[in-house]
Amino acid sequence: ATLTVFFRDN
């Protein structure tokens, strides 16, 4: 995932 979307995409 991306740095910003890490939390929800992970």
UniProtKB/Swiss-Prot annotation:
Keywords for the protein's UniProt record, in alphabetical order:
Cell wall, Secreted
Cellular component, GO annotation: extracellular region
Main location, first listed in the record: secreted
Localization, UniProt: Secreted, Cell wall
What is the protein named?
52 kDa cell wall protein
Q: What is the lineage of its organism?
A: Eukaryota, Viridiplantae, Streptophyta, Embryophyta, Tracheophyta
